[in-house]
Amino acid sequence: MKKYYVLITLIVLISLVAACAPTAPTSAPTDAPAAAAPTEVQLTENEQWAKDNGVGPYQPASEDWAAIEAAAKEEGSVCVYSNSSKIEKLIEPWSALYPDIKLDCGDTDGITTKMQAEQEAGNVVGDVWFNSDGHILYGMFMPNQWLWWYTPEGVVVSGVTAERPYAMQRHSIDVWGYNQEINPDGCPLTNWWQLTEAELNGKVFLENPLVDPSTTAKITLIVENADDMAKAYMDLYGKEWTTDEMAGPDAYGVVAENAGFLFLRKLARNHPVLEPGGDEVDEAYASLGMDSAIEPGYGLTGWDSYETTLDGELAMAPCLTMEPVVGIKKNSYVAIANKAPHPNAAKLFIKFALSEEGAKPWTAIGIYPGVDSLPLAEGMPAIGTYKLWESNDAFAWANNSAVRDFFATELLGGE
């Protein structure tokens, strides 16, 4: 028992000693580890070029135009690939402004193919894209960083957004043209569907959409705006387009998915004449002195062809009372080629092309300038006067191939 009390006493004493012992010092709090510096985004080779030259997303808010012009003079020339022969009319005013910088290249066939090949080969010749084919611009060239957008400071171009940054130099309107010499009282047509009727078999003219991507995009718009075409069918015939005898499956089991496809089927089976270019289209139905006893037909053409009529060289006039729309509004873009050999001269050219002087060759009936502040041609109605289909580059890029193949099949005898 005595040993038991001794043990208890020892335990109590040990506990007291432990309680009185000094507390171990608390460690000072350590600072939180410094946040790692953000990793700098690595630019692609093309992005680095764009940054070095101040184009695309790297364009500064303000630029020294005296320095740009001096650098452009050192470059000595600018190669502009244009799909319009009217660019030749810019040579004289350009040379007056910039005698030390040659305006080169000009009207060019196959611009998209040429510039794609140059970019893929790394042998860039063209400095500036001055072309339509927006579906290829946005669908292929922009994702591959082959073309950079550039709008000079202070220039307001309608339709330019963060998603659609390329400047539009002009908006051209395509319409159905008729021969006003044979039809002096006006266009006999009021509805697109009349173009598919037997009376006009072999009498509708257009550029070949099987080889011309711009025309392919135009007929793709018909499919995109199928609801408009359905209403126009009802307005003309008083019944739904689905009741048409050609709406069902063809010999291959292919049906017309909507009223736009039905229109293309009926047009194709009405034997349209596919021409190599716009001049040939106009000559086919609107040449002067055609036999009035023979139906001249109609052509899908630029409204600006009417300028040639005013010059006394053609009998084309636009059908301005057509349903569902009068025409198609298409865009011509300006952009700087990636790794352009003359980037400063390219900037000067775009600034010039977006000016009143640079727009003069295209200040014509049927064309609206891309810069809102520029004047219209005398007699040109304000934009919005007529209903037009707007070009849809994204839809065209996604659907052109399918629409072209459908049209080709119908031309070859889909029945």
Annotate each PLM feature.
Residues V156-V160, R170-D174, F263-L267, D311-N338:
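Periplasmic-binding protein-like
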Residues G327-D393:
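Mature extracytoplasmic/periplasmic domains
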Residues P99-D100, Q119-F130, L200-K203, S287-Y298:
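Alpha-to-beta junction loops
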Residues C79-E92, D104-Q116, V124-E280:
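Extracytoplasmic ligand-binding site segments that recognize negatively charged/polar headgroups
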Residues M1-E75, E415:
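Short, low-complexity disordered leader/linker segments with a strong preference
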Residues H135-M140, A293-A315:
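A ligand-binding cleft/hinge motif common to bilobed small-molecule-binding domains
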Residues G54-Y58, A71, D372-E415:
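An extracytoplasmic/periplasmic, membrane-proximal ligand-sensing/linker region
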Residues P38-N46, S62-K73, N83-D100, D304-S305, ...:
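Short, polar/charged alpha-helical segment
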